[in-house]
């Protein structure tokens, strides 16, 4: 392996059949490991590829940056992505996450704040424990957002299985589809389209489906103890 006991600035090609370890790293070239890559803060506008894991503190992946891991990517700080991130495993973020471009993960994605204006495809589950704002496109199997802040969607969220959205306010002006959708919030405002195959539950909520809003379930719409303002379409087949 390669161990660099200080900061790394790479504009060439660094390759190893073992682990690559460095302090703060600025990469404009290529870093390739057949095993693991670990750094402190990572500033990448080149290519970084690990056959196994990438571990870092803060990650700033620039427009031309490509990050690729055969297993997991772990960030012990914040992540900002303007480039491309691909991992066959999970993407674990201790801090906040901002995505402007493209992320593909084969496992889970966990973070505090999630701000997505790009394309976010997560094979298993997205878990957010901070504010959630989506102005891009999200595709995942499961979505679990639990925040004291707000949940905002103005574009597209497709969840193949279950969605749980808990927040101070939930505002949907875009498109949400899921098999089951559980909403836990004092106030829901929908001017977009919500389509659910099975059950929508939104109990103890000020439920505002405003003009142009559509909320439909192929099975059950459960709105117990909720104040309902409907100026759009509410639909349930059972």
Task: Give the predicted meaning of each segment.
Residues 1-238:
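Extended beta-solenoid/beta-helix repeat architectures
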